[in-house]
Amino acid sequence: MCGAEKVRHMLMGEQVLKKWKKSKKMTVAFGGILVMSVVIGGCGGREDAKKSIKIGISVYDQYDTFVSEMMKDFNDYATKKEEETGVAINIDTYNASASQSTQNSQVENMITEGCDVICVNLVDRTDPTAIIDLAEKNNIPVIFFNRELVEEDLERWTRLYYVGAQAFESGIMQGELAAEAFLTDQSLDKNGDGIFQYVVLEGEAGHQDAIVRTEYSVSTMIDSGVEVEKLGYAIANWNRAQAQTKMAQLMSQFGDSIELVIANNDDMALGAIDALKASGLTKDEWPAVIGIDGTDVGLEAVKNKEMIGTVYN
């Protein structure tokens, strides 16, 4: 690798790490808003203020790497907050296993168990009605996070909140990294036609975040002066194993015409890398792969020059 190439990877790595630090701030903000909401709702400033808070959390899939890392950060933050305030923070975490009906039952159980606040990483962002109705009936605040519900639903009751990154920002930064890579590394233009031929590994069919991330990633590349051509796409449901299968199918269909893999999250980007490794191609023959989330494993893949970048979520 020439000196210029080494510098490019070092600079991109630094940029990625800066963006990851920003995502850590989002997690801390989530914890701060969560604890503050509970304090305002039930503990703040009264002589009879409770000395403990019970928080129920339901995640759409505990095996999603980003969600798993976010929950670890949140628990670490809660421990720190306990030490600062002297208020015991008890957290019960549930895995909805990608089932909205399961998640609805979990929320009902949280209410029965006496949770002071409920946090929900929605399975189906278009179907929060049962959760909202249960919470409103029992006057328990709900903080939705990471998977944004429809705005009209969020406005149904004053004790509903949402915390999460803006999907378009992640898409813009992903597009910036991809454009920078293409414009500074001629080897990525494998057929030499001056066009970045790409495929997309999309999170979920019709999911707002997936659609917005892809749209802004592509439009940002174009705005940066990169001519692009979409070869194909596949739905991989944010899942690494599904992404490996879908990437293998895309490779079978488009072969070495693929110059860029745009993945809506790091797990799917890593699934694409798994498929590339299984294909027997050398790294020099791989298309560029880029993700979103800034997960630990995603950053490790950037460090190992398997991914050209990842951005915060």
Model-derived features: positions:
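A residue-level marker of the well-folded mature domains of exported/periplasmic proteins
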Residues: G13, K18-K25, G44-N313
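C-terminal motif of bacterial Sec signal peptides marking the signal peptidase cleavage site
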Residues: V39-G42
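Sec-dependent N-terminal signal peptides
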Residues: K24-L34
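Basic, mixed-charge low-complexity alpha-helical segments
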Residues: V35-M36, R46
